[in-house]
């Protein structure tokens, strides 16, 4: 009888512990994200600075891939979707091509940048108030279309403008933290 009671208590405590752990990792309030965000953006910028010169030297185009309409989407009601789609775009389309067009020395740096972006995405997804989105962003579609039309040059353009993307992330997050 004592063993059964003890086992029941242990199962109950394990369930409570797991539930609390789940709530703290995936809860809507995410109290640590606003304080850790500047550090994550700093890490993204530092990782980008290691490949910035390489890609900007290869970018021979004068036009901008990431323009003001994308920033407006980030700041507006489509901010969540624009951010989510742009992170996905960089992770699934730009970064793999950037690695393929990099020297062996640059590949590890591009991979590190991608890992930091993945970490940011995971943290934002856990914090539902920062990525609660459903709609599509026309500005992101324009970026993707322009990127595709540029073919190989699109990789250099997108990577050379990664710092602009980080600034847009920061603008979006600043807006969300004020709400």
Curated annotation (Swiss-Prot):
GO biological process, one term: regulation of cytokine production
Family: Belongs to the IL-10 family.
Sugar attachment sites: 100, 135
Family matches, as Pfam families: IL10
GO cellular component: extracellular space
Protein name as annotated: Viral interleukin-10 homolog
PROSITE patterns named in the record: INTERLEUKIN_10
Leader peptide range in chain numbering: 1-18
Functional description taken from the UniProt entry: Down-regulates the expression of the TAP1 gene (transporter associated with antigen processing), thereby affecting the transport of peptides into the endoplasmic reticulum and subsequent peptide loading by MHC class I molecules. In consequence, infected cells are masked for immune recognition by cytotoxic T-lymphocytes.
Main location: secreted
GO terms of molecular function: cytokine activity
Cellular localisation: Secreted
Protein source organism: Equine herpesvirus 2 (strain 86/87) (EHV-2)
Keywords: Cytokine, Disulfide bond, Evasion of host immunity by viral interleukin-like protein, Glycoprotein, Host-virus interaction, Secreted, Signal, Viral immunoevasion
Disulfide bond positions: 30-127, 80-133
């Amino acid at each position: 009888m004592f063993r059964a009671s003890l086992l029941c208590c242990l199962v109950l405590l394990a369930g409570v512990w797991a539930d609390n752990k789940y709530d703290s990792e995936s809860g809507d309030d995410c109290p640590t994200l606003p304080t850790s965000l500047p550090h994550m953006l700093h890490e993204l910028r530092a990782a980008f600075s290691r490949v910035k010169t390489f890609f900007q030297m290869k970018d021979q185009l004068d036009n901008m891939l990431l323009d003001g309409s994308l920033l407006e989407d980030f700041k507006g009601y489509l901010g969540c979707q624009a951010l989510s789609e742009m992170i996905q775009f960089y992770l699934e389309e730009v970064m793999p091509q950037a690695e393929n067009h990099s020297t062996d020395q640059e590949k590890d740096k591009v991979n590190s940048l991608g890992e930091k972006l993945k970490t940011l995405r995971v943290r934002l997804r856990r914090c539902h108030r920062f990525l609660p989105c459903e709609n599509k962003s026309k500005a992101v579609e324009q970026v993707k279309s322009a990127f595709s039309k540029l073919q190989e040059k699109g990789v250099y353009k997108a990577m050379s403008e990664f710092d602009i993307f980080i600034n847009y992330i920061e603008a979006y997050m600043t807006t969300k933290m004020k709400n």
